[in-house]
Each structure stands twice: as C-alpha cells, then as structure tokens.
From Swiss-Prot:
GO terms for biological process: acetate biosynthetic process; acetate catabolic process; acetate metabolic process; acetyl-CoA biosynthetic process from acetate; L-threonine catabolic process to propionate. It holds the Pfam family PTA_PTB. Homohexamer. GO terms for cellular component: cytosol. Induction: Expressed during exponential phase, decreases as cells enter stationary phase at pH 7.0. Expression is inhibited at pH 6.0. Part of the ackA-pta operon. It catalyses: acetyl-CoA + phosphate = acetyl phosphate + CoA. It is found in: Cytoplasm. Its main location: cytoplasm. Keywords: Acyltransferase, Cytoplasm, Transferase. It comes from Escherichia coli (strain K12). The gene is pta. This is Phosphate acetyltransferase. Residues 391-714 are annotated as: Phosphate acetyltransferase. In the N-terminal section; belongs to the CobB/CobQ family. Disulfide bonds: none annotated.
Amino acid sequence: MSRIIMLIPTGTSVGLTSVSLGVIRAMERKGVRLSVFKPIAQPRTGGDAPDQTTTIVRANSSTTTAAEPLKMSYVEGLLSSNQKDVLMEEIVANYHANTKDAEVVLVEGLVPTRKHQFAQSLNYEIAKTLNAEIVFVMSQGTDTPEQLKERIELTRNSFGGAKNTNITGVIVNKLNAPVDEQGRTRPDLSEIFDDSSKAKVNNVDPAKLQESSPLPVLGAVPWSFDLIATRAIDMARHLNATIINEGDINTRRVKSVTFCARSIPHMLEHFRAGSLLVTSADRPDVLVAACLAAMNGVEIGALLLTGGYEMDARISKLCERAFATGLPVFMVNTNTWQTSLSLQSFNLEVPVDDHERIEKVQEYVANYINADWIESLTATSERSRRLSPPAFRYQLTELARKAGKRIVLPEGDEPRTVKAAAICAERGIATCVLLGNPAEINRVAASQGVELGAGIEIVDPEVVRESYVGRLVELRKNKGMTETVAREQLEDNVVLGTLMLEQDEVDGLVSGAVHTTANTIRPPLQLIKTAPGSSLVSSVFFMLLPEQVYVYGDCAINPDPTAEQLAEIAIQSADSAAAFGIEPRVAMLSYSTGTSGAGSDVEKVREATRLAQEKRPDLMIDGPLQYDAAVMADVAKSKAPNSPVAGRATVFIFPDLNTGNTTYKAVQRSADLISIGPMLQGMRKPVNDLSRGALVDDIVYTIALTAIQSAQQQ
C-alpha cells in the first residue's frame, strides 16, 4: 500500500513548486517508485492553463509519474453548486486510477490566495479523504524562531491540532531570505535589482528552528540567489521585446539589473557577468561600452534598449564582433520608467521549459530535505531498489565528497573546465588543480562570473615544469628519453599532469575537453601503466536510461579483444558497476543466444564467458546473449529461460569496439539520454577522458568518478 504525503502551503510565495520538486528529487535519489498527484490544477496565470508542477514533472522526470489534475473552473462549479462530495469522489477515483504502482504518492495542495480563499478547507478535506500524512510548507519571512513556532502551532490547530496524528511535520523554505519592509520575499525582479542589498535578512540557525518547532522540521531550505537567475529569453518574452541580436539569449542568466542613467565611468562596476543592462536606445556610449566588455570576455546577461529608437546602422556595424560573442540585445518601445515598472511585474518562478534551472532547484532543495524522513517512507518495502539516474548522480557526488581527493585538470584555462572546477569546489566533490597561466584562468573565471575560492588550486606550468624533467627522463630512459626531449614533452600539460599523478601529488587526472582521446590516454599509458593484476586498460560508459543505469563496456579503447581480454573487460566492468552502487549482472553480448549460433565470433564470446566465470565465480556472468534477451524479461523466458542474467542484465560487454561504440552512440542519441564516460579501467592510477563536446555537468561527474576511483584503489 502506498504512503501518501500531502504538501500543504501555509500561504502564498512559500515556494511550493520548488519544495515539491526538491522532495521528488530526494525520493528519486533513494530509488523510490513515486507518483505525483495534484488533485486540482492551480496555474499562476489563472483560468484552465496547464498546472506548473504537473507539467514540470512530466517534462523533466522519466521515473516519476504525474496524474492530470481537475481543472479549477470545474472544481469551482462543483463547490458553488454545493457538490463537495462529488468532488471528493472524483479526486479519489483520479487518485486510484493513476497511482497504482507507486510506493509513495506525493500530493500537492492548493495555495491559499485572494481568489482561492477556500484552499485550506479544501486541502484539509482532501487530506482526510486520502488519509494523507500532512507536511506543511511555509517560508520564514521576517519571523524569528519563536514567531515561526507560533505560526506552525496556529496552522496545525486549523488542521485538527495535536489530535491529528497524520500531521507529520513542516518544511521551512526561503530561510534567511532578503525581505521587503512588509516582510515579503517577493517573487519578482526586486530581489535582483541593484538596491536589493538594502533588504532585511534574518539569520536563523536551522538547528534552533528544529529545537523550537512544535512539529518535526523535515526540511529547512536556505534562500539561494542562484536559484532565481532567470534566462534572458524569459525577460524578452515578458516584455514582448524585439530581438536585435539573439546571441546566447536562451542560455545566458540574469543575476542583476542595472539602469544605465549615469556616465560610463560611474557604471563600469555594473558591467559584469550576469548583468541586465537597461538603457535608452539613444545612448550609443552605453551600447559601445557593453560591447567592449563583451569583447573582453565579460558574459553580460543581456542588453535591453528602451524608447523604441532604431539602432544606428553604423553603431550596429561597429558592434558586430561583440554580437558574435553571444551578447543578447533586445529592444522595447516603452521608455525606461515604463520598462522599470514592467520588469517589476516579472515573476521569477521557474518556467516549465527551463530544464537547467529546474535541475538546479531540484538538486539544491533535495540537499536540505531530511534524509531519515525520506528513508522512512519506504522502510517497510521489500522491493529491491533500482538505481535511477538521479540516484546515481547523487551517489556519485556523495561518494566523491567522502573521498576528499585532488584531481588535476590539465586544460585549466578552458571555460567549461573552469566552471566545472568551481562547481566541484562549491559542492565539495574534489579539490581541483587547474594547470595554466593564473592570470588567464582568473580572467576566464571572471568573464563567466565564476569565483575561484577554496577548493581550487592553480598551478603555473611555467613555474613547476622544470622540476619534473628528471623524473620523466628516469621513467622513459629505456625509450631514449633525453632532457631536451623531456622539456619539449612537458610543454604538454597532460604530460605534466600525468607526472604529478605519478608522484602522488594529485589523486587523479581528467582531460579531453580540448585534447583528443589519444593525447589524453597516451601519457598515462606510458608513465602510469596498468594496475597490478590487470593486463589491459579498458573503458565503460554509464548509460543513464529513464528508469535505471546500465554499464556498457568496452566502447572506447580495445578494437578487437581476444577471449582472454574480453573476460578481463567483463570482470573490470562488473567491479566498476559494483563500486558505483549498481548490482552487476553481466551479459556477454553476441548476435546469438546460448548454443543457437556458431562461428568464431560467437565462440570468442562463449570462451570469454567461461574464463570470466572461472576467474570470478562470485560474479553473475552469462553469455552469449543477444541484447534483447539480456534486457527483456519476456524474450529471456523463451531464449534463455535458465539464465541468471537474461532479462535483467545491468552490465553489457560488447564483443568488439565497432559493436560497442556504435551501440552506445545509437542508444544515447536515439533515446536522448545522458551517458557518463568513458571511464578508464585497469590503470594503476585513475585517468579519465572527456568528449570534446562535453558539457559542464559532464566534466563535473567525470571528476567525481575519478575521485571515487582513487578512493577505491587505495
């Protein structure tokens, strides 16, 4: 039977959607089979528009289901005709029709607004009807812990008081947020106007909040400035602006708003990464200054021109190179004052199509939800947990945090690498050592609005390179290495980073955002060598499918492994899967299953399976298996009924590189899924390669993988 948790907001602007998304992510991390149930749609725009939480869950989660809520107009019609009983019956019917397979059902209540003053009484009725456990969601505002205590008590009393044993706890959102004079945490751009620093902030210790609360505090979520950074395109849409230069309008984030009414020298401090610069279109000096900043690497959020003046063609020509850097420029017909008023009404709630921000909100809020409470929701369930993609990513970061490793990044001045290093430092994933010119690295960081603080080290190759010449000569003397050649090779930061790893100055190396796979792997193979007991280096990809994570090997290194090599690849891959929380059930893949086929290719897989089983009888390995027999239970029953792996494989070993690489790319592209890797196996020390098209998140997770590998090799 499902556990039913109902999140009930105590007022407006509590951030209900953000809290719901965070709780969903916290449950997904634990592999909970979850369903989201919004009984009644309550779109912010009013009317019968799609419900925000339901739409976001459907668009962004492959493991959580969300039922279609009843339309508000229909509900209001039932209530006005005194048919509440009919409404409750429909809610129950909708609930049962859409939540049958869920372990936990998360119900999102209605927000009490001026238009929906019946919200709380209806929330109470729904909670009683579904026999749901109630969790209140509130924001702090200007309240002290004592005032919050009183507010929690009053809210509990309106839902039956202490006698209502279904009241489980409270989640306090926007803790220590800046508020206005009326105590409101305003969901509009006033939070990021340049004068927002004047806002009042209450510094409440979450521990004291727990002590004073009459209900268990199941989450205390600090307000975060980063979560309200909106895209430039969202502002352009809100203003119905004409786009002059699209640039990176879909990805650039606005973190501050500046009205450029002063002379240039008095505004330069505001020409920074993430700034929305608002100026009259007849101020070419501001436009040119912004373009100069962009050409110097400053990622200004966007430039908004007011007044409706046509841009001078000569100025437009002058700014072409700046526009090519990705600077978004858009224009409105209203004057600056009218534009200011329009910006004030911009709502900072996360748009349903802003997947990057949704992911950030989910991860951030989930980190502040009580883990013991989440664990307790399925404590009595006997079903084995699947490792979903969110659970896998969370596990990666947690294991990396515990490892506490130093990872060298030879491409230290590459923009994506710098961003990834900052994220790793912020999350405590690893200490990142950036190789490169310190001034250039700091310039790249500043241009992207990235702070390089604790958890990041910068090593100047020009300063340290000479100290590694002797060691390189010693390691490669049998290959005729001389000091002159060693100095030439050490001009390559990958070689330098590899020597740092070889001498235990760092714990792992990640490269490839700029370098080829060969350039990344060759120096470690020459200088680090294979691990004891390993005769070869292989690789795996972690394939983040909608409901679970698969391991594919080897799709990147060995072109045509022998049966002995294939057996070792299988064992290495199984151990890698287990190390990252995936129960290894290894399928040795071929074009035929069992004894149905013959030929050298099938015999190689059959022999590799036998060798792997002999070497590691503790592992669940079977083959030859066709891919469909390995993953589909119904096919497995007919093709391999006695196989312990068929129908539920988690590790897939391909017979050669051609098959493996083709399959990995076909699955990744056709299913539009995330893959992490290749992760190298069999090295004496961890080294990992990146795709040259790697995103920042790809680099972050590869750094985490590398840190975990280092911890496991000790």
